[in-house]
Amino acid sequence: MSEMTPREIVSELNKHIIGQDNAKRSVAIALRNRWRRMQLDEELRHEVTPKNILMIGPTGVGKTEIARRLAKLANAPFIKVEATKFTEVGYVGKEVDSIIRDLADSAMKMVRVQAIEKNRYRAEEMAEERILDVLIPPAKNNWGQNEQPQEPSAARQAFRKKLREGQLDDKEIEIDLAAAPMGVEIMSPPGMEEMTSQLQSMFQNLGGQKQKPRKLKIKDAMKLLIEEEAAKLVNPEELKQDAIDAVEQHGIVFIDEIDKICKRGESNGPDVSREGVQRDLLPLVEGCTVSTKHGMVKTDHILFIASGAFQVAKPSDLIPELQGRLPIRVELQALTTDDFERILTEPNASITVQYKALMATEGVTIEFTADGIKRIAQAAWQVNETTENIGARRLHTVLERLVEDISYEASDLNGQSITIDADYVSKHLDALVADEDLSRFIL
């Protein structure tokens, strides 16, 4: 898990997300508290439960982006789900327990990668020996068996040196590799994904591990052999236990669009995809045991972060029990023109940097001037005010419209330089921005 301090986490988030300091601080503290809890003695550690977070803010202000960036920083099992995909237990659709099953699968992949990386050095040595056995086959005795290993011959050592220096990378060899498991595609109804994955595992294990000869360049064979040898050094039972521990102690679940499962008005019939889902989420958030294919997972110490725009519904429309289990409330602010300007220039790999790089592949140089950036930000903000406010996502629409002609003609403009200033932006966008009907459909 991540050992970054809250200040370091916020600093890392600042590289990609503009503004929303309160939300960044809250998730940074929550992430650091995961590490702090693990430093306590076992008895007290069991009593410290995570303080779940509810992020409230209009669409396009950075709620989902915070989750995406947090997933990379956490170095812990992390899953992002949409609340609208689930239905109450007993009805057609996904059950909320599948969140924990998917989280366990994510943890399993993560710990497998870590275990393979841990054994990489030994795996590289073993892969090297297998390639050398193909290049210089070991001597056979009278019964056709490999003789007992002796001191490496001078020829073998010479080939080993060439192999390590990359001199043999493009040489083709034929080598036996583990055959890919038998692929069985099973169409399952919603809610039966767990049974499907178990059936697929059963069919894959029927064939056993078979070797299949393949002709490859040495550099490609080396990669596949390292993976194969590393997988042999990994203990599957230990992996399962490590994955379950990682989920229980460090797991993070991000539930997006939680406002869409709030009850709206009086309803006579069963509300299976709204209030029913909230009731099913309660035991997960409070703490229960969920059965997964890797083992039983306790959810007592999993951190839940929920987010929603709450434009139609209010946080108070959530059922009271769920409100109580999301004690930390963070409000994200709507973005201003200044925020749009910063979004266009400050983040690593900002939208303008992406467009410059894309056009550079055709030999076209694009330059955005300061007044051009300001005019783009103003246009995006103006369209948001007069039509639906979709936050920073509007910048993608406006910029795509702005560089459409350049993108189309880029292959004929090789070697040219184009400056996008306030006049260029006004020429291409003013008519659309001013006409509300046009901007509603085009921008």
Curated annotation (Swiss-Prot):
Superkingdom in the source lineage: Bacteria
Residues holding ATP: 18, 60-65, 256, 321, 393
Q: Which GO terms describe its biological process?
A: protein unfolding; proteolysis involved in protein catabolic process
Q: Name one GO molecular function term.
A: ATP hydrolysis activity
Q: Which UniProt keywords apply?
A: ATP-binding, Chaperone, Cytoplasm, Nucleotide-binding, Stress response
What are the subcellular locations of this protein?
A: Cytoplasm
Please provide one cellular component term from the Gene Ontology annotations of this protein: HslUV protease complex
Q: What is its main location?
A: cytoplasm
User: SMART domains, per this entry?
Assistant: AAA, ClpB_D2-small
Q: Which InterPro entries match?
A: AAA+_ATPase (IPR003593), ATP-dep_Clp_protease_ClpX (IPR050052), ATPase_AAA_core (IPR003959), Clp_ATPase_C (IPR019489), HslU (IPR004491), P-loop_NTPase (IPR027417)
Its assembly, as annotated, is: A double ring-shaped homohexamer of HslV is capped on each side by a ring-shaped HslU homohexamer. The assembly of the HslU/HslV complex is dependent on binding of ATP.
What role is this protein assigned? ATPase subunit of a proteasome-like degradation complex; this subunit has chaperone activity. The binding of ATP and its subsequent hydrolysis by HslU are essential for unfolding of protein substrates subsequently hydrolyzed by HslV. HslU recognizes the N-terminal part of its protein substrates and unfolds these before they are guided to HslV for hydrolysis.
Name the family the entry cites: Belongs to the ClpX chaperone family. HslU subfamily.
Q: What is this protein called?
A: ATP-dependent protease ATPase subunit HslU
Native source species: Enterobacter sp. (strain 638)
Read off the lineage from the record. Answer: Bacteria, Pseudomonadati, Pseudomonadota, Gammaproteobacteria, Enterobacterales
